Amino acid sequence: MFKAIKDIYLDAKNICQKDPASKNILYVIFLYPGFHAILFHRIAHFLNNLNFKFIARLISQIARFFTGIEIHPGAKIGKRLFIDHGMGIVIGETATIGNNCTIYHGVTLGGTGKDKYKRHPDL
């Protein structure tokens, strides 16, 4: 869990550095839906890995309702993700996003049609 807290801090700090509209880290924490989606995802992913799948999915659905960004709790997201203008973003269950990535509105890392194994792209 401590790793998740550190990653959340790095996400907020990264947004401050990349987005000239951000005033400070508190501005990002309270007012950026892209940050909120990442925050909810990191919590849901942690719970998903502990096999609390239902609670993890519930958290991801709440995040989607509030942010318009859908991230499956099984998706693996690296450090310092920046989601800018994130409406309509979908990140699937087996998607992997590396460190230092930026994603803009309308991006879908969706399924390939396979029923099993790796179904979503890597970034």
Language-model regions, residue ranges each:
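Terminal amphipathic alpha-helical/low-complexity segments used for targeting or macromolecular assembly
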Residues: 1-67
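Flexible, glycine/small-residue-enriched loop-and-beta-strand segment within the central core
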Residues: 49-123
